[in-house]
Structure formats: C-alpha cells, structure tokens
Amino acid sequence: MESSMNVREYSNISMIKGPLLMVQGVADSAYNELVEVEMPNGERRRGIVVDSQKGISIVQVFEGTRGISPVGTTVRFLGRGLEVKISEEMLGRIFNPLGDPLDNGPMVIKGEKRDINGEPLNPAIRDYPEEFIQTGISAIDGLNSLLRGQKLPIFSGSGLPANILAAQIAKQATVRGEESNFAVVFGAIGVRYDEALFFRKFFEETGAINRVALIMSLANEPPVMKTLTPKTALTLAEYLAFEQDMHVLAILIDMTNYCEALREISASKEEVPGRGGYPGYMYTDLAQTYERAGKVIGKKGSITQMPILTMPNDDITHPIPDLTGYITEGQITLDRSLYNKGIYPPINVLMSLSRLAKDGIGEGKTRDDHKDLSNQLFAAYAKAVDTRGLAAIIGEDSLSDTDKKYLMFGDAFERKFVSQGVNENRDIETTLDIGWEVLSILPERELTNVKVDYIKKYHPAYRGKK
C-alpha cells in the first residue's frame, strides 16, 4: 500500500493527447514521479510525470491513453519515482522496462526495489579504466580495445549487421581470468518483433542466455517504454556491479530509437524543438544515460557500456552520433562499403577510436607487442587505402613494387584480420598473431612503428627461431 502522506488524488483531467494526460490543479508534482490512473471500470494504468508547471501536470501513460475518459477517471500521484524490483534472478531472463517478465517465467521474488532513474557516478569516486575486456572481435580487441568501466559506442547504418555484432559481443565478451564473475545486461530499445525474436533465439541457442539479462521494449509500444528501457537496464547493471561485485557489460541497442522517442514525447508536449527537431535537452539526457558507467574506488565490480546507434543516412554529423561522441570515449564505426564487399563485421578501423585503449594493453595486460603492432597496422592500412586511391587514378601497373605490396596488405587485412565468423571467438593472442601474419606481406623495412625486438620475436619469418 502507498503511504497516504505521499499519495494525492485528482480527477480534473483537462486534455488527453496521444499518450499524454494533462491534469489541472496539481501544485506539488515532481518530474519523473510515478502516477496511477484508475478508470471508472476499475482498470488501472501506470505513468510518469513528464512536465509540471503553473499547476498543470503532464502525465505519460505507459500503456497508452486509449479508452481513458476525462470524466470519472482518478489520477493518483504516488510521491516516488518508478521503482523496479532488481535481483540476480534476472540473469537468464527477459523483462520489459517495468520489470514484468516477457518469457512466461515468474515475477522476480527476491531482490530490492530501486528507482530506475539512478544517479551518475560521482567523479570523485571514479576509478580509471585499465583492465582489458576481450570481445573476441579482432578489429576491436586488436586496434580499438575496450576497457572495463569504459563507454564505447558502435555507430551503425541502416541495414548494417549491428544486431548480429551486438549479440556476438554479448555472447563472447569477458574479463580474462574472471569469466565466472562476468554478466551482460542487454537493453533492446524499441526493436521490431523479428529483432526481438532473433536476440532471444540467438542467446538461447548459444547458451549465452545464462549470463545475459534482456530488458526489451518493442517498436509498437508507447515512446515512454523506449525511454525507460536503458534506465531499467542500467539500474540492474548498477546492482550487479556495485552490490554483487560483478563485471557487467551493458549493451544498449538502438539509441536512435531512444532519441526518436524523446523527440516524439517532446513534440506531444509542444516544446520548442532544437537541432534536427530533437529536444534541446537531448544532450543532457544522453549524458545521464552514458555516465551511468564506470568503476568505483573500493568496489570490485564495474559497468562497461556499449551503446549502439543507427546513423540516419550514414551521417556521422547527425545530432545523435554527434552528441554521443562528445560524451563517450571513442566509437566503433561500421562501414557500408566493407559490408558490400562481404566483410563481417564491417568495422572501419580508420574511422574508429578507443580513447582509453592505450591504458589497458601491453605487457601484463594483453601482450608486450600490442601497442606497437596496433600502431603499425593502423599506419599500414591507412597507406593501403591511400594507395588504392592512387591506383584508381594512374592504374595498378604504374605503381611501385612496394605500393603493390600495400594493396595486397589492404585486401589481406580486411579479409583475414577484420573479417571473421559470427561464431568465431578469437582470443587476443590469435588476433595479434593474425596481425603479424598480414604484416608479413610488407617488406620488413616498412615496419617502422614496431621495435626490432618484437619483429624478431613475433614476425612469421622469425617465429619459433631462437
């Protein structure tokens, strides 16, 4: 039962517009306050306050407003935010953002209720990310490494295999040596039914479901359900990380759906639009979501975040990827031209960046040659791309022998290093060895970014020799 001191009842609904109710005469409602709407027939629905000013509260109803009458309907303001019961029992299960099961399983029995809005970590108690997370994806592990506590988004385009890549990372990612203490919270935001079916089937068939908690909202649900999905997912991640000492990878897909839901809600409230028609507070809203990641001094657990978004028209300057890039620590960019070549995952390493990678690789963390090898692969592939442009102008026959080697390297790099199978889980040693293998196409004099000692130790021409 709700405390009567906190609950206030009103019945003066002035307007119903889309998923919104406008209630007059409310002087003390708070933003994100939980609301219960009781209809004359006894049916109850839940909602939250999305705006409150001049005695008018705007309530967004989770289940929609269809069938709600302004007359005879009671609106109760409950004096608290939306709380969801959180527990370790949610691993291996599928829930909606309100904590209701979607897998025909029982409700969560044990656990504690938590306000899903949470709070970003205090900067003073943050710990710096330094531990390598192995995703099993060479283009990420080898060149744009993910660290425990980092937030590293994936920028995709319409029709590119972001869903498959997200599911593969969720299945394979681990902190080496602490595999049993690793969990994945997968927030699927406004996904189509076929996408929801794919995620569920993939995790169940691969056995990854045992360590994955899936929080899901569908495309046909009200926009508020899409805005709640990452909040509930990150609330669960915070509980697992900071109460159960687990290393949690939070994957949020698709943040573009989240931002579109924000825009839809903003338009319903008739707010003045900002850049691209999105609300002016979208940057703040995204920051509140992305900053719920990191490590805390004195805590064993951590939250690593991989938000995935679709760039409209493949435009990296669009407000959603643009603002995301300001907040996060790099990006993994998927490329349509690579996808059209049959490369999976189609990661454009030259357009990708992990700003913290340098602090989590090298001797004692991955392997001593990792930094030098990464720098050499970047430099060689950049030159290979430039050489392709030159060959398109003057013809391949006019190139020098060295330039022809770079063309061969570029093709081998894409086909052997970047490309891998959906079920191919490469450890970091395998990734680095493949890097050396493709570099061996180039003359040794071209390997200027790698120490001679590493060449003698790892280059295929010397490997195994004393």
Curated annotation (Swiss-Prot):
Under the heading Pfam families, the entry gives: ATP-synt_ab, ATP-synt_ab_N, ATP-synt_VA_C
Entries under PROSITE patterns matching the protein? ATPASE_ALPHA_BETA
Q: Which CDD domains match?
A: ATP-synt_V_A-type_beta_C, ATP-synt_V_A-type_beta_N, V_A-ATPase_B
Mainly resides where?
A: membrane
How is the quaternary structure described? Has multiple subunits with at least A(3), B(3), C, D, E, F, H, I and proteolipid K(x).
Q: Which cellular component terms (GO) are annotated to the entry?
A: plasma membrane
Which PANTHER family does the record associate with it? V-TYPE PROTON ATPASE SUBUNIT B
Record's bilayer topology term: Peripheral membrane protein
Its recorded name reads A-type ATP synthase subunit B
Q: InterPro entries attached here? A: ATP-synt_VA_C, ATPase_a/bsu_AS, ATPase_F1/V1/A1_a/bsu_N, ATPase_F1/V1/A1_a/bsu_nucl-bd, P-loop_NTPase, V-ATPase_su_B/beta
Quote the SUPFAM superfamilies the UniProt record gives: P-loop containing nucleoside triphosphate hydrolases
Q: Which family does it belong to?
A: Belongs to the ATPase alpha/beta chains family.
Localization, per the record, is: Cell membrane
Instruction: List the GO molecular function terms.
Output: ATP binding; proton-transporting ATP synthase activity, rotational mechanism; proton-transporting ATPase activity, rotational mechanism
Q: Which GO terms describe its biological process?
A: proton motive force-driven plasma membrane ATP synthesis
Which species expresses this protein natively?
Answer: Metallosphaera sedula (strain ATCC 51363 / DSM 5348 / JCM 9185 / NBRC 15509 / TH2)
- Supply the alphabetized keyword list: ATP synthesis, Cell membrane, Hydrogen ion transport, Ion transport, Membrane, Transport
Any idea what job this protein has?
A: Component of the A-type ATP synthase that produces ATP from ADP in the presence of a proton gradient across the membrane. The B chain is a regulatory subunit.
